[in-house]
Amino acid sequence: MPVKRYLPFEVEVEDITLPDRTWPDKKITQAPQWCAVDLRDGNQALIDPMSPERKRRMFELLVKMGFKEIEVGFPSASQTDFDFVREIIEKNMIPDDVTIQVLVQAREHLIRRTFEACEGAKNVIVHFYNSTSILQRDVVFRMNKDQVKTLATDAAELIKTIAQDYPDTNWRWEYSPESYTGTEVEYAKEVVDAVVEVMDPTPENPIIINLPATVEMITPNVYADSIEWMHRNLNRRDSIILSLHPHNDRGTGVAAAELGYMAGADRIEGCLFGNGERTGNVCLVTLALNMLTQGVDPQLDFSDIKHIRRTVEYCNQLRVPERHPYGGDLVFTAFSGSHQDAINKGLDALAAKVKPGASSTEVAWEELRSTEWEVPYLPIDPKDVGRDYEAVIRVNSQSGKGGVAYIMKTDHGLKMPRSMQVEFSAVVQNVTDAEGGEVNSKEMWDIFATEYLDRSAPVEQIALRVENAQTENDDATITAELVVDGENQTVSGRGNGPLAAYANALESLNIDVEIQEYSQHARTSGDDAEAAAYVLAEVNGRMVWGVGIAGSITYASLKAVTSAVNRALDFKHQQLQNGGV
């Protein structure tokens, strides 16, 4: 490897020494001020930047989760961002207790455009920045230290002046010496002090000083040392909210944020599931739930992390990896037999604390919530974030999952979702346990068809008619001719898309369907191409997968819902399959 091409941090920037550091002895006992930057810092890093509709979905999610400061865009950089800021202001989408944040470079015409975008908003943080690092000064801007500082102070003066023309808004200020980690700390202090002097904050109306690891360049302990040094040495510290903005270039963004917070910071900016340029911004999900595992209230609502993940995946058009902390498909799944045994014993011990002598299957989760969580291999109760135990406690029946998935994909063209692979391999295992021997490819297909495709009771689809409304929300109306328990029925429903409309129609039959996960793909190609659809649904309280295969994605999806309904309502089958997903 060409190791000589790379300089250590102490040579490239400086050697930060803080022999009397205090942060290692600190503990995190309360949540920081949070600022979600998904709509700007996250959005700019997407292959397919968010449409206005996806931005609205993300904004609504962040508000629902409890974020009080939300960066909504860079309105001077694009018309799309400008229009979105205007929309949420003019449509009164911003709650009174939420402050929107807008990003702007320290350039006059951009600053003026930013104020135009924010006119009429109640609470706004104007976040202005310029790069101060050695590399950017020398290579990008070709400015000396005084010129870079003047750029920052001139912007501060202009912002204060323009704000007087918009007296109806509660303005707050945030300044970032961008590329802070590549900047000498004494020079960063010099620039920040100069900006603070211009803005003239008070303890009652403080300025936010954001110290971003725009590029993560060194170990988290050095970042923490630099934050503690700034915390101690900045002028007018009592009038400053010290903010962190870590990136994850070295894979230690979460650690840098936690140690930086211990070192004296008050506030953290980041993105849900760590979206952002290159390796991403710090993950606010991981940070917040790390605090929860230590008994610290993160002041954010993660009680339905599956919904949060689905929304983020939809808005970002990026998949959350299976191993992503707290939110990935597999983070609460143990494939090792010894791990599984320990988890089972831990759940039983938890139940026995509530009801002596009882096992975990004999105590309701609501009762378990009254006791402290102590289960091996699970740092958090999955149900506290809206996950469940099924995948955790059934691992021993799931051996062979990979082989089953491979045959179904290569021989039969079905790319089952991962958690469905687990479910179907358990179905196959039931057959092999009962009959012995191996299951070949044809036998496996027959098991699959019997399990998912051939069920016509208690609900059989006869005909479906779907009408899509030409609206922004993709509303759909469905009329379904069914045979239910041997009787012909015609039901209608409306919803945001065909699946939601069909679920709405089934309500009239006292069948409650909530779609939890959905995926689809082409199974074959050519004139007679088929689509396969998979639906994980909660049907009258039972969580089951359904599968549909048809000539169109829409009808395959609707057949998948019917498949899930029939599996859920077939109690004898549920006993055979021992609990579903």
Swiss-Prot record:
Question: Record's Gene Ontology CC terms?
Answer: cytoplasm
EC? Answer: 2.3.3.13
Q: Name its pathway.
A: Amino-acid biosynthesis; L-leucine biosynthesis; L-leucine from 3-methyl-2-oxobutanoate: step 1/4
**What molecular function terms (GO) are annotated for this protein?**
2-isopropylmalate synthase activity; acetyl-CoA C-acetyltransferase activity; magnesium ion binding
Keywords, alphabetical = Amino-acid biosynthesis, Branched-chain amino acid biosynthesis, Cytoplasm, Leucine biosynthesis, Magnesium, Metal-binding, Transferase
Q: Which residues bind Mg(2+)?
A: D41, H245, H247, N281
One Pfam annotation reads HMGL-like
Pyruvate carboxyltransferase domain span: 32-306
Subunit structure as annotated in this protein's UniProt entry: Homodimer.
Q: What does this protein do?
A: Catalyzes the condensation of the acetyl group of acetyl-CoA with 3-methyl-2-oxobutanoate (2-ketoisovalerate) to form 3-carboxy-3-hydroxy-4-methylpentanoate (2-isopropylmalate).
| Protein name as it appears in the record | 2-isopropylmalate synthase
Origin organism is Corynebacterium efficiens (strain DSM 44549 / YS-314 / AJ 12310 / JCM 11189 / NBRC 100395)
Question: What is the name of the gene encoding this protein?
Answer: leuA
